Amino acid sequence: MRSAHIRSVAVAVAVTTAATGLAGTAFAGPGTGVHRAAAGTTTAQVAAAARAAAFAHPAATGVGAGDELRAQDVMIDPEGARHVRFERTHRGMPVLGGDLVVHLSRLLAYTGVTRAAEHPVAPATTTARLTARQAEEKAASAAGGEAGTAALVVDARDGAAALAYQVPVDGAGGGSTVVVDALTGKVRSNTPDSDEFLSPKVLETLRRRGETLDPATATGARPQALTGLSAAAAAHYPATAHGTGKSLFVGKVALTTTQTARRSFLLKDPTRYGTETRDAKGRETESFGQGVKFTSTTDSWGNGTTTSRGSAAADAQYGITETLDFYKKAFGRKGIANNSKPARAMVHWGDKVGNAFWDSTCGCMLYGDGDGDQIKKPLVVLDVTGHELTHGVVDATAKLEPTRIDSDGNQYGEAGSLNESLADIFGSNVEFFANNPKNPPNYLLGEKLGLAQKFLRRLDHPSLDRLEGTVDYWSPQVANAEVHAGSGVSSHAFYLLAEGSGRKTIGATTYDSPTYDGSTVTGIGRTKATAVFYRALTRYMVSSTDFHDARTATLKAAKDLYGASSVEYRTVDQAWAAVNVTAADDPAARH
């Protein structure tokens, strides 16, 4: 699961440009100095124009007196459109659910807005009845941990604005963020800061069935182009080296590492922004600095079994670098947050932890070793890593959030379901990108976990999943579905857009994708479908985007990329209709 990323609203962000399509698409990327949006126009000027447009069109944008907008991202499309994603404060207080994207033409004229809150974000009062100390006590009690400093915020989620306190809480099972109503003392939300791949619901189902996960590890070696002490002749250190990982799940893999001395190597990739994997040594720490560096005298990492602590590290580093390469080569994205900063991971995290996480506090992947009972091995599998790192991409863009979380940690709501779906969509794309014969690509998630049903989720026919109760089609009840169960709606739409309906075999996997209305959908191909969904995520989705909003976002993206009269645009509409998401059934009061 992902956390509702509401710990804080950034007060300073890098303004960057971003790609729009797949490999070969021209794009402007972030770098040092001034970024040029067009001849004579900087991205700072684009952000300023978008900010001015937001205040000049208050009826459309909802921006008003007391509001301040801070640019999170500036996106420049090859065809000339500009999009600026803003986070909002009101009278100096961060607004949860107040994010918006302002759209401009090539000439910086206002063309529209995508906003998370369609209601006023000004609370009825800005005077709290609770003290910060009282809010901290309530948060500590709710989350079962030690509270940090409470800060006043405006909570504009759930259709109304309220004055609240946001409180970080450090508990035994990891950090969480609690939002407490500043007038009534009611706990409005209590959200873990980490995203677990295996949800509490699926773990409970496995326990009830007595089913264990014993992922099958790889045997044999994958041929490598570069191995050994390739940087040994370097005159100066540190230097780029090319080593070999002997992983648990994909055999031998090439790893780019850092040579620090003649026979001293560090599991850190200098060609990918310093991306690094460390050893948590059984601690449940959210501080990457507390992880122990992996070093070697031979530039060989692991032995392919759990007897070497380096084996899981090899899998993790391989999965992270493949994910980074997918996003860069497909979309020009430079790192998870598109800021040319490293991706990071810690393996051997916690004592008998049977899960893997994206942790937004750490900004890194965390992998447990398994609990020794139900989960037998570390979940350092390629699609798990691609899925979880995509939550990081969503955190850096739309910040899709669930609408509620129960006492067991299960999350609910369409925006949260869409987040899970996007993680599955791009996680499967990472497999196709890597195209590793030891991990054949497919539209299944968790197929290497050793589950009795042979997968955790699948995109072509989601309801074949009997563990989480994933749905194939939208209905009004999906708004209250657990997020992994609800994710099937948009995952199914993506598969239909990419591959079409009916029976087909791709690689070694046979698919048979149904449609709600009995229609036949002819896919446009995975490359184009992925371009549409990525552009929709980065340009047209916000924290509250639901499935009908996602339909609108992908139609806008298809129009941008291929034109409103194109086959691609029509197929996007058909794919959503085939999962029962249409303009006609758009709920009038979903916001």
Give, region by region, the residue ranges found by the protein language model.
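Topogenic and prosegment regions of secretory-pathway hydrolases and membrane enzymes
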Residues: 2-9, 15-17, 23-28, 201-276, ...
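Segments that shape or occlude catalytic/ligand-binding pockets
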Residues: 2-14, 18-215, 219, 341-358, ...
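Short, compositionally biased low-complexity segments
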Residues: 24-36, 103-118, 276-305, 462-467, ...
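Active-site neighborhood of glycoside hydrolase catalytic domains
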Residues: 389
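Zinc-dependent metallohydrolase catalytic domains
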Residues: 310-386, 394-591
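Acidic/polar low-complexity interaction segments
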Residues: 164-168, 186-329, 338, 353, ...
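Short, polar loop/linker segments at the starts of domains and inter-domain junctions
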Residues: 125-130, 265, 460-461
